[in-house]
Curated annotation (Swiss-Prot):
Keywords: ATP-binding, Ligase, Metal-binding, Nucleotide-binding, Queuosine biosynthesis, Zinc. This is 7-cyano-7-deazaguanine synthase. The lineage of its organism: Bacteria, Pseudomonadati, Thermodesulfobacteriota, Desulfovibrionia, Desulfovibrionales. Belongs to the QueC family. The gene is queC. It comes from Lawsonia intracellularis (strain PHE/MN1-00). GO terms for biological process: queuosine biosynthetic process. GO terms for molecular function: ATP binding; ligase activity, forming carbon-nitrogen bonds; zinc ion binding. Zn(2+) binds at C200, C215, C218, C221. Pathway: Purine metabolism; 7-cyano-7-deazaguanine biosynthesis. NCBIfam families: 7-cyano-7-deazaguanine synthase QueC. Binds 1 zinc ion per subunit. It catalyses: 7-carboxy-7-deazaguanine + NH4(+) + ATP = 7-cyano-7-deazaguanine + ADP + phosphate + H2O + H(+).
Length: 238
């Protein structure tokens, strides 16, 4: 899939998934604008990581440097007003009877995509990129393929333009996401993802591990760690 004569807008949080998607976007589109959201997230350090990732990824490739465009951040304080979650307040992370963790922020990706699409429309951009995936441990409803497709249809109808939402990680495991990073930018890009992106729900970006920074115990850290270890095993086997 290549759209090298097209612009695209990437929803960029500073995490592993959106960081990997940045490499994918720069490999597939001629101009990439990034957009981030400050919504009172507990792991606010990821917002600081965004700048470091953007600065360092442009040094990995002249082509990527030429294609990387502007960055925008929007404030969405409304989520904390809608109710507490373990992402927007200091709650202990627990799971309900259906296995859904209280890190789920209801409607978050729908909000994000709606704002991104409105911004894209004003800038004549018809391609959005988001790092959602169904294989993520969480089972967040708004990360699932049918939810993204429904949102794409609603936005296209509501804006009167065909909007395409790209989800390059939708069917990938975390190990496969590490593999994609290696394929896109080699070991230097893997190192950038490992050292500069942030996943930890508890906002720990000081404790270092082989797979990156984090507390090592929250669900996001465990998922990242397990994916890294599986990735290394497959890499060594080959």
């Amino acid at each position: 899939m290549y759209h090298l004569n097209q612009k695209a807008l990437l929803l960029f949080s500073g995490g592993q998934d959106s960081g990997t998607c940045l490499g994918w976007a720069l490999s597939n589109f001629s101009h990439i604008i990034t957009i981030g959201f400050s919504y009172g997230q507990r792991h606010s350090v990821e917002m600081q990581c965004r700048t470091n990732i953007r600065n360092k990824i442009s040094k990995l490739s002249k082509i990527w440097e030429q294609r990387l465009g502007e960055d925008y951040i929007f404030s969405l304080d409304i989520f904390s007003q809608l109710g507490e979650t373990a992402i927007t307040s200091e709650l202990e992370i627990v799971f309900d009877k259906q296995g859904l963790p209280n890190t789920f922020v209801p409607g978050r990706n729908i909000f994000f995509l709606t704002i991104a699409a409105a911004f894209a429309w004003r800038n004549s951009i018809r391609h959005l990129i988001i790092g959602t995936c169904e294989t993520d441990f969480s089972g967040y409803p708004d990360c699932q393929d049918n939810s993204i497709k429904a949102t794409q249809l609603a936005l296209s109808l509501g804006l009167g333009e065909d909007i395409t939402i790209h989800t390059p990680l939708m069917w990938l495991t975390k190990a496969q996401t590490w593999e994609l990073a290696l394929h896109l930018g080699g070991s230097k890009f893997v190192d950038l993802i490992r050292n500069e992106t942030h996943s930890c729900y508890l906002n720990d970006h000081t404790t270092s591990h082989e797979w990156g920074y984090g507390c090592g115990t929250c669900p996001a850290c465990k998922l990242r760690k397990n994916g890294w270890e599986t990735f290394l095993m497959k890499k060594r086997a080959n």
